Amino acid sequence: MKREAFSPSASSTGAGTPLIELAGITRSFRNGEIETRVLHGIDLTIYPGEFVAIVGASGSGKSTLMNILGCLDRPSSGTYRFMGEDVAGFDRDELARLRREAFGFVFQSYNLLGGASARENVEVPAVYSGMPPAERHARAEQLLASLGLGERSHHRPSQLSGGQQQRVSIARALMNGGRIILADEPTGALDSRSGEEVMKLLRQLSAEGHTIILITHAREVAEMAQRIIEIRDGHIVADPGPSKPQGPEPDFAPHVDRTSSMSDLVEATRTALRALRANLFRSALTLLGIVIGVASVIAMLAIGDGAKAKVVDQISAMGTNLLTVRPGAPNQRGRETTATLVIEDVRAIAELPNVLASVPEQSASVTLRADNTDQRTTANATSWNYGVARNWPVASGTFFSAEDEARYATVAVLGQTTAGALFPGVDPIGQYVLVNNIPFQVIGVMSPKGATPWGQDQDDIVFVPFTTGSLRVTGQRYLRNVTVAVEDVSRIDATQNEVSQLLLARHGVEDFQIRNMASVIDTVSATQNTLTILLGTVAAISLLVGGIGVMNIMLVSVTERTREIGIRMATGARMKNILQQFLIEALVVSALGGLIGVAVGLGTAAVIALFDTPIKYSLLPVVLAFGCAFATGLVFGYLPARKAARLDPVVALASE
């Protein structure tokens, strides 16, 4: 059966009920095989409102006793009852609640957060108790003003004197009510005047009904208390006994109302930013790892996607609705010179359903001459509907017609590269060129096509009618290939099968090959995707290294800020509060690095694009890169955060 949660702020003691009861308390420490007992069977009872001084020399066990009284440490044996409730059964979070709602600590070394202002230091217990921001700001200001520090609420501890820092510590102890003030050598680091002021404050708080437990080695300081308990070698050697209160205990607990999780996150984020500002150079180096990782992912994927888009566009420009029939059986060498395709095959293919155009092609390397200029290029003998099939219009003039083919006209259409080489700065339309010393009249110039994905200049070409070319230019009867344009691209595979069956029936043997441009695009896209993934993986490794850097720095931060963690635990921070704080610090680093990395990655890609490198931006890589950076912070920040949350309060407070 689950025990009902104990709430010290919701409980009150009767006039005759002890506030604290210790019975047979011992505390031992083990170092290897050696066990040292510091406390021996401590019996102690403290009632509400008492001003108790525990006095003893160094090593007497008084600080260990204070740690147990303040629930910073657990006894090795014995019973500790707080308001009748056995503290031994409390878990870490319940002990944190007890410290938060019942105890206020005043330390000899002040134990203030160096990067926070006086007001922010005072507010720490209220942050963990869930007091709304406006209310805790007002209460902190009121407490500081009552202690004479109203004008120094925004000063950091380094800007305050020792006495002022101790008053800030007292104000912090009172923030959540300060039902019990545990003061460990509160005057030890102060001059005599400041020490007297602190003791005056403690006597005043005692008069107001606060229970004061003073730990000191100085007899003259202890004399200011109502009850002096002497401890020596872990034993209580003198105790006049408790004084029962004459009336009910005052209510010290301020109004606390749980704030939303969003408010907790905002406060944790503010604390994280303050911690990062405290070590700007180190934070910048940590950010750099994430920035490089995110920027690399975005830039490399943009380059990979750009290269893929360029290749696909180039292939698409050749026609996505095309089938190319070539002579020669599959895997046959030298199929370019194999004589299997004839013009009758072209006419038969044109009769098939879903065929928009069936275009014969022959080619030969020729020399063109215009005036005194020679140009070595490729002559393509084809039909009048070549431009329709290839989706390649003329830029000027016209393409030859079916009538030109029928009458074996000696007309030519030049590619952009060829036209520019033969007729620089001159309109070639109507001019004559010699194709292997045969005069052809230029009737058109094709629009620019650019290079193929394999680097071949498609504009370095001359087109002539098929009939004329096969008779006077190539001297061939057989075709180099047949280009088949389909009407419905969704049925291109079915049309390919029909063309294959037709040619197989006509030839009686599979002496041809059919290439589907849509399949080529799919293959090239798959290859480019693989390369893009490879680039992204290499970049992701950079992000992984950045994440390891975050974990390394956070582990160092936990080590450096162990004392701060102890202070926060002493003021009531739960394990989840510490875990949340350091996890958010890692996430803030990763998120900032991710945002900067996105900007750097996009900027890098833009600069690379200036050098004619194809770049393609898309939202998905940006989201993935930032998401991975955030996830990296979460994953690699968890271990340091968990380490921080599991620290022992006493060990953490004792660290330097």
Curated annotation (Swiss-Prot):
SUPFAM superfamilies: P-loop containing nucleoside triphosphate hydrolases (SSF52540). Its main location: membrane. ATP binds at residues 56-63. Pfam families: ABC_tran (PF00005), FtsX (PF02687), MacB_PCD (PF12704). Residues 20-258 form the ABC transporter domain. It is found in: Cell inner membrane. InterPro entries: AAA+_ATPase (IPR003593), ABC3_permease_C (IPR003838), ABC_transporter-like_ATP-bd (IPR003439), ABC_transporter-like_CS (IPR017871), MacB-like_ATP-bd (IPR017911), MacB_PCD (IPR025857), Macrolide_Exporter_MacB (IPR050250), P-loop_NTPase (IPR027417). The chain crosses the membrane at residues 284-304, 531-551, 591-611, 619-639. The keyword Cell division does not apply. Its EC number is 7.6.2.-. Homodimer. PANTHER family: MACROLIDE EXPORT ATP-BINDING_PERMEASE PROTEIN MACB, MEMBRANE COMPONENT OF TRANSPORTER-RELATED. This is Macrolide export ATP-binding/permease protein MacB. It comes from Azoarcus sp. (strain BH72). The gene is macB.
